Amino acid sequence: MLFRSQTGKSTTCVSYLLHYAVFNDNVNIAILANKASTARDLLGRLQLAYENLPKWMQQGIISWNKGSLELENGSKISSNSTSSSAVRGGSYNVIFLDEFAFIPNHIADDFFASVYPTISSGQSTKVIIVSTPRGMNHFYRMWHDAERNKNEYVPTDVHWSEVPGRDAAWKEQTIANTSEQQFKVEFECEFLGSVNTLINPSKLKNLVYEDPIKRNRSEEHTSELQSPCNLVC
């Protein structure tokens, strides 16, 4: 999911996780974020939402603390920072990854290498990835592949204009108080310009992420080239 700043992404996802835990027995849910404090904050919001549910909708409480909770129906929710060992060895029905673009590339790669067996072993395991962009990194690659149906993720984009109270006048005021580049990153969710780069973002925009051309070692030509074609050196 590609969300603009302050569009209610955390509230929406936390509400879904709470609903899933209350109305499904014996499910395990993991809330992971780029920082442990952020993950605990999300769990705290979920706990607050639970406390405000009608009494008839609430389950009994087995355990309740800052890092996890367990309901009487056997459902468990835990929170942690995103790392290769965060959910290793566990069995989860839902894994929620918040601000995934802000996870360093090597940690994100190690995380999926360790957690993918857990994901693939469950027939109904859900992975929810939410973030604002931060350059052309692993999250950009996953998002770009999802748009081209090259993976099984479903891209969901929430535009800033869909939020009540945000219109053209609000956009002009926000740009005046910040900058156009900051607005493009935080509210237009442009991957380019979200981090400082040596090469101008307008040039990087032309370098679209593509799969590398496959080469046949036994031959001197590439397998993706088709004749006739023009090569410019």
Task: Put a short name on every predicted segment.
Residues D110, S161-E219:
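ATPase catalytic-site recognition across NTP-hydrolyzing enzymes
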Residues S5, E99-I103:
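Conserved Walker B
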Residues L48-N52, Q58, F102-T178:
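ASCE P-loop NTPase helicase motor core
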Residues R40-N93:
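Inter-Walker segment of RecA-like/P-loop motor cores
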Residues Y20-R40:
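Conserved SF1/SF2 helicase motif Ia
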Residues M1-L2, E219-C233:
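Single conserved hydrophobic/aromatic residue that forms the stacking wall/gate
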Residues F3-L17:
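Walker A/P-loop
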Residues Q6, N34, T132-R134:
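Conserved H-loop
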